[in-house]
Amino acid sequence: MERGSRKTRVGRVVSDKMDKTVVVLVEDFVRHPLYGKAMKRTNKFKTHDELNECGIGDKVKIMETKPLSKDKRWRLVQIVQKAK
C-alpha cells in the first residue's frame, strides 16, 4: 500500500493515558440507505503517538499504517488544533 493511498481521518483525542498511544474519536455523517435520514456514526481508533505530544480534546489528523500492536493500526500525522 503506497503512502499516498492510505486512508486519513480527522478526529479528536478522547484518551491519552497510555504510553505512545492515544484514542481518537472520529465522527462521520451517513445517510440511511432506505429512509435517507442523516445519522452520526462514531468510531474510536487507537493511534500511535511517538512523541506523546497529544492531549485530551486535541483535533488531530491520523493515517492508516501497518499493524503496530493488537489494536493499533493508525498513526498520528499532525495536530490540527490544540485543546484550549
Curated annotation (Swiss-Prot):
GO terms for molecular function: rRNA binding; structural constituent of ribosome. It comes from the Bacteria. One of its GO terms (biological process) is translation. Disulfide bonds: none annotated. GO terms for cellular component: cytosolic small ribosomal subunit. The keyword Nucleotidyltransferase does not apply. Gene3D superfamilies: Nucleic acid-binding proteins. Pfam families: Ribosomal_S17. The keyword Cell division does not apply. Keywords: Ribonucleoprotein, Ribosomal protein, RNA-binding, rRNA-binding. CDD domains: Ribosomal_uS17. One of the primary rRNA binding proteins, it binds specifically to the 5'-end of 16S ribosomal RNA. Belongs to the universal ribosomal protein uS17 family. Part of the 30S ribosomal subunit. This is Small ribosomal subunit protein uS17. It comes from Alkaliphilus metalliredigens (strain QYMF). The lineage of its organism: Bacteria, Bacillati, Bacillota, Clostridia, Peptostreptococcales. The gene is rpsQ.
